[in-house]
């Protein structure tokens, strides 16, 4: 099922600015939030789509990639737009900030975002899709990948402050990140408008990261793919996701592996299957053939006389290695018999002569089948 356009999901134009995006998100998030729509799966799905769209479009780098490549920018080796790269419910930034504003005003701050001292926040988790060959899954490999992500600013070491200066406790909220205001009979708590909930202000922001404590950069990482890895395996690289803000801990990077289909082998766990076509005469008279295996060797298969289609030959320990084990699966050779095509006149004559001199013993399966079929139909005429 094709993903909806992020701009259409939020109901904004492709030229919408940050303020328009945030306003549209707030409105839709309030409408479809699970707390307001309990046991409504459609509302929950819509809520997730709205969050994913906003998390992508609010980030200038992700938005630029989406505008150029669409959803493909976050697939097949790119950063995940939903669930991980977009931050989801667990890490990211804008999503929780906005809901802190929304529900802080509604419920007196009960849903304020958890922040550590000084406004430090954990960075978002990232997703990277990697495709490898069956041969690489067999041997294992070390892959070099490049991941565009936010990293800790090397100038201010993540503090956001200009070197030689320090962040200061916010004078408006006294470091709590929240302020209270009386509205009639109610006291409403909301995010501090001065420090935006961080509890600190930065009078002299770092010139490189502009007070954010992190910058966007493409990093090169080395990923170890163990021998025997299976399709769909997820590898977690702890602390290799986006850097946290204001010196907060980094998120994690998740590598999602897919193994490409192979030209000859099909995989079932640690076992491999290979369909091998042989000639009709080889099947009838017997013979041998060599089959290449993933370990780089060749194995000889002996075909006995009268081999039938579908016959399987097992080559022990010629399959896939079992992940983190000394065990190895088997390779199963499945026989397919190729019927001759484009026969010459002489070949046809010889086959016809062979048919004439054949006995029931030469084809016991077909002879027995048609005899049983005749008996079956005879029961209807009795």
UniProtKB/Swiss-Prot annotation:
Binding site for Zn(2+) 2: 170, 173, 192, 195
Cellular component, GO, one term: cytoplasm
Keyword set, alphabetical order: Chaperone, Cytoplasm, DNA replication, Metal-binding, Repeat, Stress response, Zinc, Zinc-finger
Domain spans labelled J: 5-70
Keyword Zinc: yes
Entry cofactors: Zn(2+)
Cofactor mode of binding and number, as noted: Binds 2 Zn(2+) ions per monomer.
Binding site for Zn(2+) 1: 153, 156, 206, 209
GO MF terms, alphabetically ordered: ATP binding; heat shock protein binding; unfolded protein binding; zinc ion binding
Subcellular location: Cytoplasm
Major place of residence: cytoplasm
GO BP: any one term: chaperone cofactor-dependent protein refolding
Family: Belongs to the DnaJ family.
Record's comment describing the protein's domains: The J domain is necessary and sufficient to stimulate DnaK ATPase activity. Zinc center 1 plays an important role in the autonomous, DnaK-independent chaperone activity of DnaJ. Zinc center 2 is essential for interaction with DnaK and for DnaJ activity.
Subunit: Homodimer.
Protein name from the UniProt record: Chaperone protein DnaJ
Source organism (scientific name): Rhizobium rhizogenes (strain K84 / ATCC BAA-868) (Agrobacterium radiobacter)
Species lineage: Bacteria, Pseudomonadati, Pseudomonadota, Alphaproteobacteria, Hyphomicrobiales
């Amino acid at each position: 099922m094709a993903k909806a356009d992020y701009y259409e999901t939020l109901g904004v134009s492709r030229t919408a600015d940050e303020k328009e995006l945030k306003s549209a998100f707030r409105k839709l998030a309030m409408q479809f939030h699970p707390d307001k729509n309990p046991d409504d799966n459609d509302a929950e799905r819509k809520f997730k789509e709205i969050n994913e769209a906003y998390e992508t479009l609010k980030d200038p780098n992700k938005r630029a990639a989406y505008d150029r490549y669409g959803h493909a920018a976050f697939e097949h080796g790119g950063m995940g737009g939903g669930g991980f790269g977009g931050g989801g419910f667990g890490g990211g930034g804008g999503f929780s900030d906005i809901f802190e504003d929304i529900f802080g005003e509604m419920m007196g701050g009960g849903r304020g975002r958890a922040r550590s001292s000084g406004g430090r926040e954990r960075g978002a988790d990232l997703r990277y899709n990697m495709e490898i060959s069956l041969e690489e899954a067999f041997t294992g490999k070390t892959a070099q990948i490049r991941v565009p992500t936010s990293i800790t600013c090397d100038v201010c070491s993540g503090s956001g402050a200009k070197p030689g200066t320090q962040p200061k406790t916010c004078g408006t909220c006294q470091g709590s990140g929240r302020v209270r205001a009386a509205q009639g009979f109610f006291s409403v708590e909301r995010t501090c408008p001065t420090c935006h909930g961080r509890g600190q202000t930065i009078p002299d922001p770092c010139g490189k990261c502009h007070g954010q404590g992190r910058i966007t950069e493409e990093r090169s990482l080395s990923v170890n793919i163990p021998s025997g890895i299976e399709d769909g395996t997820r590898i977690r690289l702890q602390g290799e996701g986006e850097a946290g803000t204001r010196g907060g801990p980094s998120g994690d990077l998740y590598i999602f592996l897919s193994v490409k289909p192979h030209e000859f082998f099909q995989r079932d766990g640690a076992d491999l299957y290979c369909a091998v076509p042989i000639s009709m005469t080889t099947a009838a008279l017997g013979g041998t053939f060599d089959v290449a295996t993933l370990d780089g060797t060749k194995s000889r298969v002996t075909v006995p006389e009268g081999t039938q289609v579908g016959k399987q030959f097992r080559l022990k320990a010629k399959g896939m290695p079992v992940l983190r084990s000394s065990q190895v699966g088997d390779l199963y050779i499945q026989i397919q018999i190729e019927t001759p095509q484009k026969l010459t006149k002489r070949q046809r004559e010889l086959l016809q002569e062979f048919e004439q001199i054949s006995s029931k013993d030469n084809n016991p399966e077909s002879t027995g089948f048609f005899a049983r079929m005749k008996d079956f139909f005879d029961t209807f005429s009795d």
